[in-house]
Amino acid sequence: VICGKKNIFFTNNDTAYESAISLFKKGINVKAVIDIREKSDSSIVKEAESLGIKIYWSHTVVDTHGYKKLKQISIMELSKDGQSLASSNKIIINCDCLGMAGGWTPAVHLFTQSGGKLKFREEDQVFIPNKYPSEQISIGSCNGDFELDKIIKNSSNSLKDFLEINKTDFDDLSVVTSNETSKKNIWLLPSNKVIGKTKPFVDYQNDATAKDIKLALREGFRSIEHVKRYTTTGMGTDQ
């Protein structure tokens, strides 16, 4: 099923390029990729560039246009730190589908339901398992490892510690090291519109916005699981 005939991708990481390239190779129009990062040297981005896919580096989507369906988006250039807009110049691009990629989040639901406590990892801005309620370990994506080489290395180390052994089958595996460029984390992207006059959605399916999360914090919620339930962010089929 083709989502749109004029597709645009908005991203802060490399994974959006996989979808853009896949559509392009099937003859489906990819108008552009809007990337909030200044650059990426990963192989998949270089492939997209070699195919002629237009990339707007250090830009953000500030508005969408259309009645009952998407017809255009407006983008503007970001400052170097990503906290403000670099200029008042606006670019309008025709499209009928906007795909978004904000990076991966560890699936920690079962861990927290078992009584486990989370910690926030600053370097990539994710919540990962911290205090375990029983004899268990978390490996792979649920522990915040998303590249295959990291998954194998960290899984091996975790199993060695947990089982008190010196070697695992993982040690004999040979994996090509990923050259994926890190995502850029900006919690609330700047806009040319007044804060409060727009709805900066965090969860499109549940209609949860950044304003809802701020309200939850103002009400005294601190645990991410409490904030989630108060705002419905990430609940239901999002899980």
Residue map of PLM features:
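Residues forming the flavin
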Residues: V1-Q239
